[in-house]
Amino acid sequence: MFRKAILIIHGFAGGTYDEEYLSNSLEFVKNFDVFSFTLPGHESRKDKATRADWIQSARNHVEMLINHGYKDIYVIGHSMGGVIASIVASEYKEIKKVVLAAAAFQYLNSGSNKTNVKELASLIKRNVIDYSAEEIFSRFLKMPLNSLKEFMSIVKENQDVIKSVDAPILILHGKNDKLVPLTSSRYIYNNVKSKSKIYYKIKGVNHDIFNSKRKEEICEIIIKFLKKNHKCIIEEEI
């Protein structure tokens, strides 16, 4: 099949609505078929989904695309979805390109991923106060403590997975992100196996990257990356 499948994976406490503008933009691109899904436990806050459920759900969607004949699959992951996208990219040869937006290999500004659940909840509350109660922080607070624990575990347990990702990769991170620090994308850039890697630090953009004031420009960057073959190493502030 000559058409390309694009699989978008949303972040923790989020949903497909976070990437709706991106999805709509990609659907207008010739030969792109766009797919997204809601991670288990995110349809209802009462669900007790685990990190294994999140990862398996992504695997199931990748395998569904393979079974439908797609030979070229591009994955886009936002926040925790970036960690999950990296996991499946390391496992399936059919995944030919990867886009990671504010991928949460680290979180908040605790200085460590060893923070416990109560400390993380406290950090979230403090950030809500300090940064004008951004919607995404508020969503975090509505998630069960067990889900927060699962989020912390998926990050901690998959620190090395990026070292097995060898597909061309585009890394995007807003410079005003208060949830996932820039050091997370720096870690990805320094450790990814890919020989072709592009890292853009984007001025004036927070964690909600696909709904920011620069969302149109960001989508254009992603489309350009997915349409063309890149063999380059770029790190730039834009």
PLM features per residue range, with description:
Residues 12-24:
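The serine-hydrolase catalytic nucleophile loop
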Residues 21-22, 167, 181-190:
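Short alpha-helix in the alpha/beta-hydrolase fold that links the catalytic acid
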Residues 27-46:
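Conserved alpha/beta-hydrolase
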Residues 77-81, 85:
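Gly/Ala-rich beta-loop-alpha elbow adjacent to hydrolase catalytic centers
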Residues 165, 171-173, 177:
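Short beta-strand/loop motif that positions the catalytic acidic residue
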Residues 176-180, 208:
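Acidic catalytic loop of the alpha/beta-hydrolase fold
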Residues 190-208:
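Catalytic histidine neighborhood in serine/cysteine hydrolases
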Residues 204-238:
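Catalytic active-site module of serine/aspartate enzymes centered on a nucleophile-bearing elbow/loop
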